[in-house]
């Protein structure tokens, strides 16, 4: 990977990770991990929109999609929160909400991107 490409991914990833860290402050032990859920849903929606506007492989795509969206979303934290949930019911609700919500947000993002520009 070229240094320029790696640099834009790293910069975008840092920004996405900072946003995820800030959103994680909304997680509470009593509720679903709303911060992580929000980060993952926003990332899916944004990636869907970006897929309609940006050419894959371009520096802007690498920055926004691989970097920001990649740093914002988190599969490992999602799985950790699933196995750490206090009940099977809470874990199930979180899993279904995350997966179905992510799919719906991605589809919505793709449609919004096509509707408004690409």
Sequence positions of predicted segments:
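Membrane-interface helix-loop junctions in multi-pass transporters/channels
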Residues: 1-118
């Amino acid at each position: 990977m070229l240094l320029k490409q790696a640099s834009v991914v790293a910069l975008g990833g840092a920004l996405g990770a900072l946003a995820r860290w800030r959103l994680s402050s909304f997680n509470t032990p009593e509720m679903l991990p709303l911060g992580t859920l929000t980060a993952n849903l926003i990332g899916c929606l944004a990636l869907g929109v970006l897929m309609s506007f940006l050419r894959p492989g371009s520096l802007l795509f690498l920055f926004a999609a691989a970097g920001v969206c990649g740093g914002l979303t988190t599969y490992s934290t999602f799985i950790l929160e699933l196995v750490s949930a206090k009940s099977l019911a809470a874990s199930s609700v979180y899993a279904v909400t995350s997966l179905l919500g992510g799919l719906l947000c991605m589809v919505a993002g793709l449609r919004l991107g096509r509707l408004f520009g690409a």
